Each structure stands twice: as structure tokens, then as C-alpha cells.
Regions:
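Glycine-rich catalytic cores of cysteine/serine-nucleophile enzymes that process amide/ester linkages
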Residues: 107-119, 177-185
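Short acidic alpha-helical/loop segments enriched in Asp/Glu that coordinate divalent cations
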Residues: 134-146
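Short His-Asn-centered micro-motif
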Residues: 67-69, 178-179
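Short gly/pro-enriched beta-turn/loop segments at secondary-structure junctions
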Residues: 16-18, 109, 119-123, 171
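...with weaker cross-activation on analogous glycine-rich loops/strands in unrelated enzymes
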Residues: 144-185
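Short helix-to-loop capping/linker segments positioned immediately adjacent to catalytic or ligand/cofactor-binding
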Residues: 10-14, 109-116, 164
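Conserved beta-strand-loop surface patch within small alpha/beta domains used
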Residues: 1-65, 71-104
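Active-site nucleophilic cysteine motif
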Residues: 115-132
């Protein structure tokens, strides 16, 4: 555990049962945690950072993550957290049950415009699993790989630990791959 992570966890413990909040900044000397005061009117359910604290963090270094906690809550970002994360365009680190969960900023899962290798089918389920706490590696995808006897989705998902199940055994959280206009999913 890094010194930054230790400082984040200590701040969350001190603030509980209220949500803690702060920033991770990067400076030439390294990464640091800047704790902030939660100015929310309901600090046990929400967090709010004063604009002055945000400016203070920006003046001390490059903000690389926004941090807050869910004391007694769940280890993933709420719907409101996700909306605010997208507006901030920052990774968010969430303290929950003594652990730090790191969420990169991903666009909303619905309403995306398809762009091969950027917001394609693999990116969609990679982002969905990331939001649920499971990391999947990204991989390079050449255009038209499906026309060159490659099956990148199935091959790369197997490396990540996914495996094929009969449709009759499918359950929530499984991925369904379909072929539309191609011979491979």
C-alpha cells in the first residue's frame, strides 16, 4: 500500500459515518492525497467539495483522481457519482469497507456512437465490467479483423477468464455475442 493510499484510508476512517472526500494530485515529488471537507448538507449520504478546495488542489499539482467514501455502502459508484464523474472527466477512487476501488472515467453505456477500437462492442462490455469492479485488458484491434480469420473478442475474452456457456445457462452479468453482417462475433 502506498503512502497516498494509507492517507486516503485514514481520512475515510476519521470522517465516518460521513463520506470523506479529497483529491489525489501528482507533483514532481510524487503523488499526494489532499483531504477536503465534505460540505454536503447530508454528509452521511453525499459529498460535496468546496470550490476553494478544488482550486487549492489544482494549485498544488495535477489532479489525477477524485476520492470519496461510501461508509457502510456499496463498493461501486452510484448513478449520481457516475454522472458527476463524467462531468469531472477524472478517475474516481472510492473507499468502501477498508478498500480503495479505482474507477477510470468511462462514458455512459447507453447511447454511444459506434467507433471501432474506441467505443465498439468490446469497449462496451469492458466498461460495463469495469463499473462492476472487474478489470479486462484493452487490446489493439485492426480494422476488418473479422474478415481476416480472426476472432479477437472470443480469443481475448478467454485470456481474461471468460468461457462459453449454453444459452440455457446464461445469467445476469453474462455477455451475449451476436453476429450481424459478419461470420464471427
Amino acid at each position: 500500500m502506498t503512502q497516498t493510499e494509507s492517507a486516503i484510508l485514514a481520512h475515510a476512517r476519521r470522517c465516518a459515518p460521513a463520506e470523506s472526500c479529497g483529491f489525489v494530485i501528482s507533483t514532481p515529488e510524487g503523488e499526494w492525497y489532499i483531504p477536503c471537507v465534505n460540505i454536503s448538507a447530508e454528509p452521511e449520504a453525499y459529498f460535496r467539495i468546496a470550490p476553494e478546495d478544488w482550486l487549492r488542489a489544482e494549485m498544488q499539482g495535477e489532479i489525477v483522481a477524485l476520492v470519496h467514501s461510501h461508509p457502510g455502502g456499496l463498493p461501486w459508484l452510484s448513478e449520481a457519482d457516475r454522472r458527476l464523474q463524467i462531468k469531472s472527466a477524472l478517475p474516481w477512487w472510492l473507499v468502501c469497507r477498508g478498500d480503495i476501488h479505482k474507477f477510470r472515467c468511462v462514458p455512459h453505456l447507453t447511447g454511444r456512437r459506434f467507433e471501432h477500437g474506441v467505443t465498439d462492442c468490446y469497449t462496451l462490455f469492458r466498461d460495463a465490467y469495469h463499473l462492476a469492479g472487474t478489470e479486462m485488458p484493452d487490446f489493439h484491434r485492426e480494422d476488418d479483423w473479422w474478415r481476416n480469420d480472426q476472432n479477437l473478442y472470443l480469443d481475448n475474452m478467454a485470456v481474461t477468464g471468460f468461457y462459453r456457456v449454453p444459452l440455457s445457462s446464461a445469467q445476469a452479468g453474462d455477455i451475449l455475442l451476436c453476429c450481424f453482417g459478419a461470420s464471427v462475433p
